[in-house]
Amino acid sequence: AQTTTIDVGAAIFQIPGRTPANCAMTAATLDTLSGGRFRLGLGVSGPQVSEGWHGVRFDKPLARTREYVDIVRMALRRERVSYDGEFWQLPLPDGPGKSLTLTVHPVRDSLPIYLAAIGPKNLELCGEIADGWLAIFFSPEDAAGLMEPIVAGRAKVDKTMEGFDVVPTVPVVPGKDVEACAELVRPYAALYVGGMGSRDKNFYNQLMSRMGYEQAAIEVQDKYMSKDYAGAAAAVPFEF
């Protein structure tokens, strides 16, 4: 290892891409290799990726996320995993499976878990069950509205915001000309706002609309879905 103090983040492990047990095994291994410096980021993804890439139905994403985090935490505490949920039953009730314990010994039995959340209900869930939030397109001007459901989620479990991490995802372009640098970020924003999801269900597009750029969000999506990628990028407002 070349570092000793900097933490290692997972960015976003897609929940439909790994079983909870596989996720816990991966997290425990990375925590061990880093000497207790790993931070686990999770996200439920969206219907196109979940169903088109992973073959997992995108139904009840909030309930699925809750169960997933429950099981991951249980496994990382090295408890015998026995879970009777809507999406996961461990062990399966009609076969030879039995409750098992994680064989890897993580440095800590309570790894920090971050959720990538966008919608108000997912943000509230994040505040309730996670240790931090992985934010995209975070704006200080919109922080109060975005944080409100997280604060509500914390309150549901009698917790304050103390110790809760807010981690904005910020694309960085070095340079002295701000507008020229923004041109390099526009295609990145257009990909998410215009192409990540369907016309009816694109969480990034909905976020852009909630931030006050509804007409721009429509234009970016229209152009992107028409394969006018350059036009979609150009339609992303500089202020966004």
Predicted regions located by residue number:
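Active-site-adjacent structural elements that line small-molecule/cofactor binding pockets in enzymes
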Residues: 1-240
